[in-house]
Amino acid sequence: MFTQTLQLLSGIPIDMVDQSQDQRAQQAIELFFFAYRSFTAVPDQILQEKGLGRVHHRILYFVGRNPKLNINELLQILGVSKQALNAPLRKLTELGLIEVETASHDRRVKQLSLSKAGAKLETQLTQSQTQHLARAFRRCGDKALDGWIKIMQSLPTA
């Protein structure tokens, strides 16, 4: 199955794919899955206790990094539709975690910022992930980190 997918994506006939490369790709997929599950475990638990999910975390994270972010900018960052963003953003606003202001330059533009409670939650969520990454980086060293960063930068456009 994976080999067929690889052929569709690469245009290379299945019989020309290096099986060791195929196996390494499968191993990378599995490692990526387990790493992501571990990376999100603590935030998922915190979010679940509050009736929230990963989409809420992503919104909190990017609004926290970009105060006064407007809704269209957030849509571009997240790569979702207005419809997909509407319910989770409304919930965060209703819970008092996100504040919505009208932009001074254009009354049609809504700008988003974290409230104090939102900033506290976002810090708690992100801190657990920052610590998780820091432990892994310490174990692997700078050379491995440089390689990992290159891979992560290339994945969105691969």
Where are these regions (language model features)?
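Short, locally clustered residues in the helix-turn-helix/winged-helix DNA-binding domain
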Residues: 33, 61-65, 126
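Charged, amphipathic alpha-helical coiled-coil/dimerization segments
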Residues: 40, 90-150
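N-terminal helix-turn-helix DNA-binding core of bacterial DNA-binding proteins
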Residues: 41-81
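Residues within helix-turn-helix
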Residues: 71-72, 83, 90, 110
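N-terminal leader segment of winged-helix/HTH proteins
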Residues: 1-50
